[in-house]
UniProtKB/Swiss-Prot annotation:
It is found in: Golgi apparatus membrane. The keyword Membrane applies. This is Globoside alpha-1,3-N-acetylgalactosaminyltransferase 1. One of its GO terms (cellular component) is Golgi membrane. The gene is Gbgt1. Residues 28-347 are lumenal. It comes from Mus musculus. SUPFAM superfamilies: Nucleotide-diphospho-sugar transferases (SSF53448).
Length: 347
């Protein structure tokens, strides 16, 4: 009797295991998108596994002379240089450009830049590109992705060797808030369709800005944020976070590290893809509830960076406002806004 029962038990065990395996094969693909909210269009798109370009490790530094780091020597900057989560805060005096050049140039990296010029903002394209050609990632391969509703308005700007400009037509919108809200979605789709095969790092910047001094590989990192020039010296309770709890971008008074600017973010293309997807999903969640965050995508960007800390933070010298006098703590301005009539631009 024992042997038949043992055989019967073994048969039931094998049958149950086979059934579970078949059930798993049937539902595993469904599980990949089961967490996507019902209101999102094309949930499969947001779960794409992209074959990103292979990560390139830094090369050993050989036969290069540079000053010895001295822990006890007074630093050349008055700014904080390290966040509480051990991410570097980059500013003039915190890095050696020649040392970084020797480490990064052998990697043959391609750095992408997305910029949007819709409506009257096309008037800023020429100055932006000319300043980028003079100062942005000199000596590296650069691919500008210019999104515009009017490709005929893009001026011809001479580009250096290894530097490309792709003009990508997009729909125009009458309200500037709608343009801002659509940017995360557009960048995310562009990475999925194209940029993940073409660039190693991607920066997303505003077109009404100009480069004023060299911008190099010191800015490269997994996920990079820039401190907003208007709020780097004020307590976080005064940050213009979204304070309504009904919004996905809600931030409590006791939360937050820095207030980051929406005019600049970047990082490894895979991380930027994940970041823009998360922000776009949060924007859609608000839209489903008829809510628009206080500062649109910038509010969602700041909410995301509280939960998911940036691996590198850029000081306000990388995102300055020309209307403000430069404080003594900033030794240099690298990227700043241009003077403009905001009311005219938004009409």
């Amino acid at each position: 009797m024992t042997r038949p029962r043992l055989a019967q038990g073994l048969a039931f065990f094998l049958l149950g295991g086979t059934g579970l395996w078949v059930l798993w094969k049937f539902i595993k693909d469904w599980l990949l998108v089961s967490y996507i909210p019902y209101y999102l269009p094309c949930p499969e798109f947001f779960n794409m596994k992209l074959p990103f370009r292979k990560e390139k490790p830094l090369q050993p530094v050989t036969q290069l002379q540079y000053p010895q780091p001295k822990l006890l020597e007074h630093g050349p900057t008055e700014l904080l240089t390290l966040t509480p989560w051990l991410a570097p805060i980059v500013s003039e005096g915190t890095f050696d450009p020649e040392l970084l050049k020797s480490m990064y140039q052998p990697l043959n990296l391609t750095i992408g830049v997305t910029v949007f010029a819709v409506g009257k903002y096309t008037c800023f394209i020429q100055r932006f590109l000319e300043s980028a050609e003079e100062f942005f990632m000199r000596g590296y391969q650069v691919h500008y992705y210019l999104f515009t509703h009017d490709p005929t308005a893009v001026p011809r700007v001479p580009l250096g060797p290894g530097r490309l400009l792709s003009i990508i037509p997009i729909q125009g919108y009458s309200r500037w808030e709608e343009i801002s809200m659509r940017r995360m979605e557009t960048i995310n789709k562009h990475i999925a369709k194209r940029a993940h095969k073409e660039v190693d790092y991607l920066f997303c910047v505003d077109v009404d800005m100009v480069f004023r001094n060299p911008w190099g590989p010191e800015t490269l990192g997994d996920l990079v944020a820039a401190i907003h020039p208007g709020y780097f010296a004020v307590p976080r309770r005064k940050f213009p976070y979204e304070r309504r709890q009904v919004s996905s971008a809600f931030v409590a008074d006791n939360e937050g590290d820095f207030y980051y600017g929406g005019a600049l973010f970047g990082g490894r293309v895979a991380r930027v893809y994940e970041f823009t997807r998360a922000c776009h999903m949060a924007i859609l969640a608000d839209k489903a509830n008829s809510i628009m965050a206080a500062w649109q995508e910038e509010s969602h960007l700041n909410r995301h960076f509280i939960w998911h800390k940036p691996s590198k933070v850029l000081s306000p010298e990388y995102l300055w406002d020309e209307r403000k006098p430069r404080p003594r703590s900033l030794k240099m301005i690298r990227f700043s806004s241009v003077k403009k009539n905001a009311n005219w631009l938004r009409t």
